[in-house]
Regions:
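C-terminal tails and terminal domains of large nucleic-acid-associated
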Residues: 561-597
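Long, amphipathic alpha-helical segments that form or neighbor coiled-coils/leucine zippers used
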Residues: 547-550, 565
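ASCE RecA-like P-loop NTPase motor cores
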Residues: 1-540, 544, 553, 557, ...
């Protein structure tokens, strides 16, 4: 993919289905393109509780968020890169299809300063404030500026460098780029373009038109509501309008974005994809997972907004602050690469060329796959587990239900097998710790359900056993089976055993595909004289354990909550979202336990 990007020389958007994978792709592309713009665009919320209303219980839930300032800066940096005119690669999650504001308006609000330009100091300050920069003559941070005599220092919201504009009277004498900590000069420039500090903002003339449009919609809507909803909507909207007229923005201003953008009811909002223009390359990573996510975003958002609008918390125009519908997203698919080990029918139908990348540089083959009858399957499974355990290897066993996973784990434990089970109700921190303990050899077998598919990278696993493999369905279709086989493909002794009494179409297809891939790799290994070797991968350090929370005193819990929260923020800043999520889950458990102890 990196070679395609280099050869096409197009601006490129890479979409991944979660923050962790996006961060990995971002890091890799930064290494591949050290001299190019590589940006990162994901949701900037460490915590997000959307505004909603539950009519059954008459419960209004206010929007509650915790914004990661580092990621907000990177989002602004990504859009600034795209409007800079330089070749740019952006790695994003499905956040890229959510409303972002007009790229035209955002660029219109940018401040261009050139050496020798005539501009009054007060005018420049006014423009910075309009672009949502905050004056702070004491402490400088991204998004701040300060004024000292005829010198204006600015740290763009998307940069670590400081811009110093030196004036002589009403003329720009010099533009310098400084290190914002040491204030040492890094260079000079004759032209600088400073993009706004926020994505949601509009020029004053557009704001006036939008206010009129919002007032008109409010007037029309009030005639359709009963007294309670009418009073609620009128009070809320008028307060927002006052804030917009006085300050240029309000809390939840994105819900009025249709009026600011000049869009018609139902018309799609602007999003990150609009910053790319017409000619760009789109790469959808793990497309068999990412595309269904893109499909589902609109429906969930619409359902939540409907209650808010029906009961007078929002104007109907709030519907139009939304993610793209999938058919709208498809309009951006012009030059696209779908990347997937198991592409669905959609990708196959859309693609005019399918390029297979089957060979691994490590020489590792897809696992040997065997189908065995269900009769005496438990005895057979225990025998196979024993063989792996003697060799210091691990086993994954996948069942169809949570109850089956728990019962199987209990049965194996009675047979002196060191086993644990894993399912969706186990929190993120516990999941990661279980996998870590499996790799360390604290136990030998992990029993799970669908969690044994994408992203479980355990080189120590040499056996994957699939129970009820002939039960056709989502967890036993061709795609799922191949993904599950893949959990044993990191080990040179990788084997997958399917316990089934019938060879279903899915099993037959998965066996044929796996054999085809094995043959390709074997041929490649012979040609290049490669001897397959098990992947060597470091085992991460333990973040925290869960079992000790209930035994701690309130004082110790309070102390730990402070430490875990600090750890969570550090991981988030470092873009290690997997560990940040683990810390968040532990923090919530600590807080629940503290509340229980305080009630006693």
């Amino acid at each position: 993919v990196a070679n395609v990007i280099a050869q096409t020389r197009k601006n490129t958007l890479v979409i991944s289905h979660n923050k962790t994978l996006a961060a990995q792709l971002y890091s890799e592309l930064k290494q591949f393109f050290p001299k190019n713009n590589v940006g990162y665009f994901v949701s900037y919320y460490d915590y997000y509780q959307p505004e909603s209303y539950l009519p059954q219980t008459d419960t209004y839930i206010e929007k509650d968020t915790q914004i990661n300032e580092k990621i907000e800066k990177m989002r602004l940096e990504a859009t600034a890169m795209l409007l800079s005119g330089e070749p740019t690669i952006i790695v994003a999650t499905v956040s890229c299809i959510y409303s972002l504001g007009s790229p035209g308006e955002w660029e219109k609000m940018a401040i261009t300063v050139t050496a020798g330009q005539n501009v009054e100091r007060s005018e420049l300050i006014k423009k910075l404030i309009s672009a949502r920069y905050e004056r702070n003559d004491v402490e400088m941070a991204p998004g701040n500026f300060r004024v000292r005599g005829d010198t204006i220092d600015i740290i763009p919201a998307y940069s670590e460098d400081m811009i110093r504009i030196s004036l002589f009277g009403d003329e720009v004498e010099k533009i310098s780029i400084l290190d914002h900590i040491s204030l040492s000069e890094k260079g000079k420039t004759n032209l600088i373009k400073i993009f706004p500090a926020k994505h949601y903002l509009v020029a004053s003339d557009v704001r006036q038109k939008a206010v009129k449009s919002i007032k008109k919609e409010l007037k029309d809507r009030l005639t359709q509501l009963n007294e309670l909803e009418k009073q609620r909507l009128e009070m809320r909207t008028k307060f927002d309008l006052e804030m917009i007229e006085e300050l240029g923005y309000c809390s939840g201003i994105e819900n009025y974005s249709r009026h600011f953008d000049g869009r018609k009811a139902g018309e799609k909002a602007f999003c990150l994809l609009d910053f790319f223009g017409d000619d760009f390359l789109l790469v959808i990573d793990e497309s068999h997972v990412t595309l269904p996510q893109l499909h589902g975003m609109y429906a969930g958002d619409h359902t939540r907004k409907k209650s808010l609008i029906d009961y007078g918390f929002r104007l109907p125009s709030a519907f139009d602050n939304r993610p793209l519908k999938f058919e709208e997203f498809e309009q951006y698919i012009r030059n696209c690469i779908f990347v997937s080990a198991t592409p669905s029918d959609y990708e196959r139908k859309k693609s005019f060329h399918i390029a297979e990348q089957l060979v691994r540089p490590t020489g590792l083959l897809d696992p040997v796959v065997e189908v065995r009858p269900t009769k005496n399957q438990m005895d057979d499974l225990i025998s196979e587990i024993s063989k792996r355990t003697k060799n210091g290897e691990r086993t994954l066993v996948t069942t169809l239900t949570k109850r089956m996973a728990e019962d199987l784990a209990e049965y194996l434990a009675k047979k002196d097998v060191r086993v644990r089970y894993l399912h969706s109700e186990i929190e993120g921190l516990q999941r990661t710790e279980l996998i870590r303990q499996l790799r360390l050899g604290d136990f030998d077998v992990l029993v799970g359900i669908n969690l044994l598919r994408e992203g479980l990278d355990i080189p120590e696993v040499s056996l994957v056993a699939i129970l009820d493999a002939d039960k056709e369905g989502f967890l036993r279709n061709n795609t799922s089976l191949i993904q599950t086989f893949g959990r044993a493909s990191r080990n040179v002794h990788g084997t997958a055993i399917l316990y089934a009494d019938t060879i279903t179409k899915s099993i037959k297809s998965a066996l044929e595909e796996t054999e085809r891939r094995r043959n390709k790799q074997i041929e490649y290994n012979k040609t290049h004289k490669i001897t397959p070797k098990t992947i060597i991968k470091s085992i991460p350090e333990q973040v925290a354990t869960l079992d000790d929370i209930k035994n701690k005193s309130p004082h110790d819990l309070n102390k730990e909550s402070i430490e875990v929260e600090a750890q969570m923020k550090k991981y988030a800043v470092d873009l290690d979202f997997e560990k940040a999520i683990e810390c968040r889950d532990r923090l919530r458990r600590i807080q629940v336990e503290m509340e229980k102890k305080n009630e006693r």
